[in-house]
Amino acid sequence: MNTTRREFIAGGAAAVGAGTVFAGAKTASVQQQGTALPKVRIAAIGTGGRGHTDLHSFLRSGLCEISCAADVYAPNLEWVRKEQPQAKIYADYRKMLAECAGQYDAVSIMTPDHSHAVAFFEASKYNVPVYCAKPLAHTIDETLAMMRVAREKKIITQVSHHGNSEPGMPLLREWMESGIFGKALEAHVYCCGPNGYYMEPPEWANQPAEPPKGLDWELWQGPVKRRPYIKGLVPRGRWRSWAMYGEGCLGDWSCHLIGPVATALDLDMPTAVTMDDERGFDPKKTPLTFPHAAHYRFEFPAKGNRGPFIYHWYECMRRAPRPAAYEPELPFDTVKSRWCGGYLVCEKETLMFGATGASGLRVIPHSHMKAIKPHLPPKKYPRYKDHWAEFLQAVQQKRPANTPFEMGGKFTIMGFMGMIATRFPGRRLTFDPVSMRCTNIPEANALMGPDWTDAARAEYGRFL
């Protein structure tokens, strides 16, 4: 590898400060265009599903190429062979990272959630920037470890929370910091509707199926305990319905819908979480799946001039309450409409937003938005045109990206605290926000860490 290039790009990780400000601090440069910097060479771990989508978003920027790619499902690699013929192809990413060391400037991790942590730990050996799919990991302890390793090794990182690069994110923060709406009181967020994507029949877990042709099932399982293949896991991504691989609707979407509110209000970790399910979800009977009509209640402590704050999450078949300020002539049925979004109730007004990055942010009803528009605060925080180009330019310019693990990890952990509450329906779990341990139900702490194989724990347990 060319030494100058190595020093210019890959060596840039050493120039990144260890501390990264939560809630979207300004970066050194915001997507400078027209630069003549070297293209970033990506080592791609996972090329199907979101991997296919995000890698194409990287390529469309014109700032990168794929130098090598690994996927455990052979058909996922066909497009790479055709569109990036220079890329070396692998099934096992560990072999790829080792054999191609020095031939890539950044790593993308777009695997199922249960493999994020070990893939990052492996990539961290090579001290190159890392882009990782959301949620950042599969458990709280994995997430904390990834944040710590990135911080200690000064690795440039970005989480695929693309909403953080959309204009609604800084806009909501500016609105709330202005004080024009008064103090925030509570948020109500809804997601997924009657979505079978998160509602697989529990009995499928006891009906083993044959893995599809081209899938290396052993490699796909990565660090977790071995089980027979369940139909539908690959290639359509139905693994999110199963607790050993994914985190259901809340784990999948929390960064998109908790992130904007947490950023705008500068929320610390919740100190209590409660889950109830209208359909009588019993985790003892169905320990591998998730509730189909859940409501989560996150309690955040008072901070500064803001009092205690309650964040409500409704998913799948659970209807969110109609906001009192919503236009009376418009229908509001979060299940029938399959909406993803939410509303933030403040002392003076109610704000409504969409599925990612507080998209479509507005005051409700429309008449209030029209009246208050002339009084809205000016822009204060940077806007980003492209989440993927932002990461690549951060690599080129040797600076932090706008959604590092320090930020994306906090959003991930907030959602995962709800995941733990899922296993204790109707019980209020209290948490120590410093130790990140449950203080009133000791058995909940057994769910903080991963259920790895002995081999995985021997290899990567030192990171936890």
Predicted ranges, named:
Residues 1-16:
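N-terminal secretory signal peptides and thylakoid transit peptides that target proteins
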Residues 73, 110-115, 136-138, 143, ...:
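Short, solvent-exposed turn/loop segments enriched in Gly/Ser/Thr/Pro and often Arg
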Residues 15, 19-84, 163-166, 261:
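N-terminal Rossmann-like dinucleotide-binding module
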Residues 9, 55, 81, 94-97, ...:
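Non-transmembrane alpha-helical segments in soluble domains
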Residues 67, 105, 185:
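Conserved acidic residues
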Residues 48, 87-145:
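Beta-loop-alpha module in the N-terminal Rossmann-like domain of NAD(P)-dependent dehydrogenases
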Residues 129-131, 137-214:
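A contiguous active-site-proximal alpha/beta segment in oxidoreductase catalytic domains
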Residues 171, 183, 188-194, 198-406, ...:
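Contiguous beta-strand/loop segments that form the cofactor/metal-binding neighborhood of enzyme cores
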